[in-house]
A protein has these predicted regions:
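Cysteine-rich, disulfide-stabilized extracellular repeat modules
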Residues: 101, 126, 138, 166-169, ...
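Intrinsic disorder/low-complexity segments
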Residues: 153-163
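Short loop/turn segments that connect beta-strands within beta-propeller blades
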Residues: 44-48, 94-97, 147-148, 211-215, ...
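Carboxylate/His-rich catalytic cores and anion/metal-binding grooves
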Residues: 16-26, 33-37, 82-100
Length: 284
């Protein structure tokens, strides 16, 4: 990932951590002024050569959320304009840097803002399908794209405004007035994707298993609290570390399949047990 900032003006910054404040200019593209240029390259350690993606003129463009195909023959990039209201999912040949003929694979526009924050993720049991995350219905959700089934890239209106176009058959995996925060991984045995979401409450973070075929979701672990979750390599278990207003801290090993026993690793004592505590309520 190469960034050329030679054309960007210097912006004066003051370093106050030195004994006497010093001036340390920083590259900052002010609104309406020239921005940096980016190029994405693939370095081959065997040949010691770099092939750059032939993405065209990099002026006022951002290349984000870079990911590989499972066979390592292709590179996927979400390209964003400087206004950050037009996103394109594109694929390139990893050996030549040439773009795929049916690029873009997905296109999303909005009058104000699009926010692609996650690279695509292929299903470990089916490399012809991948998951794309989008906020096109107003909340960040998962969309399953099938590369075996091409469709005419017709423009569709999005629920949150703007529009989108798809080159592959696409199915929305999750939906609702809540946010998918991130993908932890997969349980290949149950064919489920393990996610963190705000479905229980916007003030919480909970783990869920989502069946890729049906879209059905299953809560993993305790419903209450803010959960920090680590997924095992197999995807069969999580280490769930969580707290709430009434739970000081619990750490548990929880099966993601919904079957089996939860094992408690830690049940912390309440350090405020001897105090008369007020009733805590939170509103939005």
């Amino acid at each position: 990932y190469r960034m050329d900032e030679s054309m960007v003006t210097d912006y004066p910054q003051v370093n106050t951590s030195t004994r006497i404040a010093t001036l340390e200019p920083d590259k900052y593209p002010m609104a309406g002024m020239t921005s940096h240029k980016e190029t994405v390259g693939i370095y081959n350690p065997a040949t010691q050569k770099t092939v750059y993606l032939k993405a065209g003129d990099p002026t006022d463009r951002y290349f984000t959320n870079i990911s590989w195909s499972p066979d390592e023959k292709s590179v996927y990039v979400i390209e964003l304009n400087r206004d950050q209201n037009h996103a394109l999912l594109c694929c390139y040949d990893a050996e030549t840097g040439e773009p795929l003929k049916n690029n873009p694979l997905y296109e999303e526009k909005h009058t104000k803002y699009v926010e692609p924050q996650h690279p695509i993720v292929f299903l470990p049991w089916d490399h012809t399908k991948f998951i794309y995350q989008s906020q096109r219905d107003g909340y960040n959700h998962l969309y399953l794209m099938d590369t075996k089934t091409s469709v005419y890239p017709e423009s569709h209106g999005a629920a949150a405004g703007g529009s989108y176009r798809e080159s592959y058959k696409t199915r929305q995996l999750t939906q609702g007035n809540w946010v998918v925060q991130n993908i932890l991984g997969f349980n290949e045995k149950t064919k489920e994707v393990i996610i963190m979401s705000t479905e229980v409450s916007p003030l919480q973070s909970n783990a869920y298993a989502v069946n890729v075929k049906t879209g059905k979701r299953r809560l993993i672990g305790n419903k209450d609290g803010m959960h920090h979750v680590q997924l095992s390599g197999s995807g069969n278990y999580v280490i769930d570390n969580y707290t709430s207003f009434t739970i000081p801290r619990n750490i548990e090993i929880v099966p993601t399949s919904g079957k089996g026993k939860t094992i408690s690793l830690l049940t912390a004592t309440n350090p405020l047990e001897a105090y008369n505590m007020p009733e805590i309520t939170v509103g939005t």
